[in-house]
Amino acid sequence: MPSLADVPLAVHASYSREEILAAVGWTSKGRTPSTMREGVAWCPDINTDVLLVTLKKTDTDYSPTTMYRDFALSPELFHWESQSTTTSSSPTGQRYINHRRNGTNVLLFVREAKTNSLGASPYVLLGPADYVTHEGDRPMAVTWRLHRSMPTEIYLASRAAVA
């Protein structure tokens, strides 16, 4: 079985959604990137949750139930909101909370906006992250600790997205 170490992605590098999903094996089950509607993908082949975050959301691109407040708390800590139906007692919520104990991984990718002057904006892999704490349900507000500090420009963009 492949592991996270076998995934051909580099921390702090930029990738399209299609490249990310192919690299983590999400598309190997006959799924196509266009069928992924939400910003989370559970990849059982590598025991990894992939979180795709857009920092600056607009009413034209996102519904009221997907206007999640995702932002950096510090260069090492990231505040992320789960899907609007996820509770801390659900299997998905429990997977987030107990990922280290259960031997699963979380990969956090961010981009500033959905599009840029060239089309779809790429995501930057902030890297593996560990659960710190959470508050609430539907959505869960989770704090993740990055294994490596995020680049300064991403930290500043993330802070600006909530200002």
Region spans (language model):
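Compact mixed alphabeta submodule
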Residues: 115-163
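C-terminal accessory/connector segments of nucleic-acid motor ATPases
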Residues: 1-9
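Acidic, glycine-rich low-complexity segments with interspersed aromatic residues
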Residues: 11-122
